[in-house]
C-alpha cells in the first residue's frame, strides 16, 4: 500500500534504544554472571520515536514531539530520528534526563536491560512549550498518535492540565483523528480518542481485572463496551499477542488470528500496530479495513 502524501504527528514519550551485542564465552570470576565480549553497539529511536520510525519506513511524512533533556542522549536521539527521515521537534529541559534503554544481547537473546530515565510529569513551562510545538505541527496532519510509555510526557502536569486533552481538543477542531497507545490506569486522559490500542495486560488493568487471568470473549466484549462508553472512545483495538487482535466499536466485534512466528525480542510490537493502523486511517481507509 502506498502512503505517499499521508502526514502523521506522533506525540509522546521519546527515548533512545541502545543495543550492545557480543559473545559469552565465560563466567566472571568476580560474580556468577556472564562476561559479554562486545562485537557491536548501535542505537535506534525508541518509545514514541519508534512509532515515528515505523511510520517513516511506511512512507508516511512523520513529525514527532516530546520531552528530552539537554544531554548527549538527546543529541543521539535527534540524529537517530533524522536518519530515519522523521521531523523531530523536541522540548529540551536542563532539569530532565532523556530516557535511554540499553539492551545487552548474545546470540540474539537479551541478557540484561539497563534503564536510564527520569519519570515525572511536564512542568508548566514544559507544557506550554509542548503546546506551542503541537500548534505549529498540527495543521495539515491526517492523524495524530499519542504514544504513552508512562515516562511523564503525557501525564497530567503538576497544575492538573493534560497534554492529551489539549491534543484531542485541538485535533478535534481540525477534524483530525487521534489514536492512543495507553499506559497506566488513568485512561480518562485519552477520553474522546477515535481509537485506543491496549495490549491484554493494559486492557485488564484499565478494567480493574487481574492481567494474568484470561478473559472470556463475552466478558471481554462487555468490558470493552463499558470502557468505550465511559471514556467516549470511538473504538478499542485490543492486541492479544499470539491470540491476534480484536476490534471493538459500534459494529459486531472483529477478531483477527495471529500467524505464529518465533520472535526473540517482542519489544515494539505495539508501536508497529498503531503506526500501521494510523497510516491506513490517514490514507482514508475505514477502521475495519485498517485493522485488517
Question: How would you name each of these model-derived features?
Answer:
Residues 151-152, 156-253:
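Conserved phosphate/ATP/ADP-binding segment of small-molecule kinases
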Residues 26-30, 193-201, 243-270, 274:
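Flexible glycine/proline-rich, aromatic-decorated loop/lid segments
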Residues 8-11, 145-146, 179, 197:
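Generic enzyme active-site microenvironment
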Residues 5-8, 16-146:
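Conserved N-terminal subdomain of the carbohydrate kinase-like
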Residues 234, 259-292:
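Conserved post-catalytic alpha-helical subdomain immediately downstream of the catalytic base
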Residues 3, 138-139, 187-191:
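A short, aliphatic-rich alpha-helical micro-motif
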Residues 13-14, 149, 272:
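Active-site metal-binding loops of divalent metal-dependent hydrolases
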Amino acid at each position: 500500500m502506498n502512503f505517499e502524501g499521508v502526514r502523521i504527528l506522533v506525540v509522546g514519550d521519546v527515548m533512545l534504544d541502545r543495543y550492545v551485542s557480543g559473545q559469552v564465552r565465560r563466567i566472571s570470576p568476580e560474580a556468577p554472571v556472564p562476561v559479554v565480549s562486545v562485537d557491536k553497539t548501535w542505537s535506534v529511536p525508541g518509545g514514541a520515536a519508534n512509532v515515528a520510525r515505523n511510520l517513516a519506513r511506511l512512507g508516511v511524512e512523520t513529525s514527532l514531539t516530546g520531552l528530552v533533556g539537554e544531554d548527549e542522549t538527546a543529541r543521539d536521539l535527534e540524529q537517530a530520528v533524522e536518519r530515519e527521515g522523521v521531523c523531530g521537534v523536541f522540548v529540551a529541559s536542563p532539569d530532565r534526563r532523556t530516557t535511554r534503554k540499553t539492551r545487552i544481547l548474545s546470540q540474539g537473546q537479551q541478557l540484561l536491560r539497563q534503564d536510564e530515565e527520569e519519570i515525572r510529569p511536564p512542568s508548566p513551562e514544559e507544557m506550554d512549550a509542548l503546546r506551542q510545538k503541537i500548534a505549529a505541527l498540527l495543521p495539515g496532519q491526517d492523524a495524530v498518535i499519542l504514544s504513552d510509555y508512562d515516562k511523564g510526557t503525557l501525564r497530567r502536569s503538576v497544575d492538573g492540565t493534560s497534554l492529551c486533552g489539549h491534543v484531542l481538543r485541538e485535533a478535534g477542531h481540525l477534524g483530525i483523528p487521534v489514536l492512543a497507545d495507553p499506559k497506566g490506569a488513568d485512561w480518562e486522559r485519552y477520553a474522546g480518542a477515535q481509537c485506543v490500542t491496549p495490549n491484554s495486560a493494559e486492557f485488564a488493568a484499565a478494567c480493574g481485572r487481574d492481567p494474568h487471568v484470561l478473559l472470556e470473549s463475552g466478558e471481554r466484549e462487555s468490558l470493552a463496551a463499558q470502557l468505550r462508553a465511559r471514556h467516549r472512545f470511538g473504538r478499542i483495538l485490543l492486541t492479544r499477542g499470539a491470540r491476534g487482535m480484536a476490534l471493538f466499536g459500534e459494529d459486531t466485534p472483529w477478531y483477527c488470528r495471529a500467524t505464529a512466528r518465533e520472535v526473540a525480542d517482542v519489544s515494539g510490537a505495539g508501536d508497529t500496530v498503531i503506526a500501521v493502523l494510523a497510516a491506513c486511517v490517514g490514507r482514508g481507509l475505514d477502521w475495519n479495513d485498517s485493522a485488517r
